[in-house]
Amino acid sequence: MEFVFLGTGAGVPSKGRNVSAIALQLLEERGQTWLFDCGEATQHQILHTSVRPRRIEKIFITHLHGDHIFGLPGLLGSRSFQGGTTPLTVYGPKGIKQFIEVALSVSTTHVKYPLEVVEITEEGTVFEDNEFYVETKRLSHGIECFGYRIVEKDIQGALLVDKLLEMGVKPGPIFKRLKDGEVVELEDGTILNGNEFIGPPQKGRIITILGDTRYCEASRELAQDADVLVHEATFAAEDEQQAYDYFHSTSKQAASIALQANAKRLILTHISSRYQGDTYKELLKEARELFSNTEIATDLKSFPVEK
C-alpha cells in the first residue's frame, strides 16, 4: 500500500503544485489502484509515476469543484484508448454522473470498458468486499463534500507450521484444510481443529482521506485511530479566519484533528499557491508543534503505508 500524490495544490495549478489528485496504490493487496479526486492534468502527472491508468479500479471524488474533477473526463477516455478493459467505478456527490455523461457525450468520447458511477446521497458505507470497506461522511465546505475512511479488514493469521511439524504432521493438502479452519482426522485417529493452529490475525490498516473542509467533528470521526490521515492545509495558522470564511483549514487545525482522533500519521496537502518555494515549510512547522508525526506532500511524492 502506497500513496502517490499527483496534485497537492489548492484551487488552481501553480508552478510547483498541480491541483488535487491522490493515487492509493493497492498493488500487493488487490493489484489495483484507487484514485481520490482528479483535477486537471492528473493524467499528465501520472506519466511521471508508476501509476497505470489501466489498473485504476475506483475513483472517489470528494466534491465537484473544478480543481477536483476537471481531469476526470480525459482520464476516463485515455484509459479506454490505452486498452483498459476492466470495470471502473466512480463514486462522488450528486451531479458527478451528469458531469461525466455530458463531458463524454459532447466530446464523443467512447469508453470501451464497463463504467459505473455511484452518486453518494447518504453517509455510511459506499463500498465493501472481502478485503476493504469505505465509509464516508459529509464535511464542512461551501458545497457538498465528502471525506473517505478506507478500512482494510483484518488479515487471517498464519498457519502455525512449526507446531504441526512438532506433532509429526507432514506438509501437504492437510495444511490448507487446517488453515481453512477445517476439523481434520489423522490416520492415527487424532482430531485436529484448524482454528487451533492459526496465529493471531493481523490488524488491517485505516486510511482517512478528507476533501476540502473547515475544522469539523466529521473529520475527527473519519480519522479516528487512522494509520494515516490526509488532511487539507490550505492556510497557515495566522489566516484561520480566512480559512473559515472560505471553508478551508489551517495546518494547525489539521494537526488538531489528527491529535484528537489518535491518528498515527498526518500528511498535509491542498496547499495554497501563496506558499511558494520553501515557504510551505512554515505550515509543516506549525502542524508539528501540535502533532509531531506530520509530513507535507509535494507533487509526485510517494508515501508507503507499512503494515
From Swiss-Prot:
Annotated positions binding Zn(2+) 1: H63, H65, H141, D212
Enzyme Commission code: 3.1.26.11
Catalytic machinery residues: D67 (proton acceptor)
Pfam families (UniProt xref): Lactamase_B (PF00753), Lactamase_B_2 (PF12706)
Listed InterPro entries: Metallo-B-lactamas, RibonucZ/Hydroxyglut_hydro, RNase_Z/BN
Catalytic activity: Endonucleolytic cleavage of RNA, removing extra 3' nucleotides from tRNA precursor, generating 3' termini of tRNAs. A 3'-hydroxy group is left at the tRNA terminus and a 5'-phosphoryl group is left at the trailer molecule
Family: Belongs to the RNase Z family.
The protein's name in its UniProt record: Ribonuclease Z
Species per Swiss-Prot/TrEMBL record: Bacillus cereus (strain ATCC 14579 / DSM 31 / CCUG 7414 / JCM 2152 / NBRC 15305 / NCIMB 9373 / NCTC 2599 / NRRL B-3711)
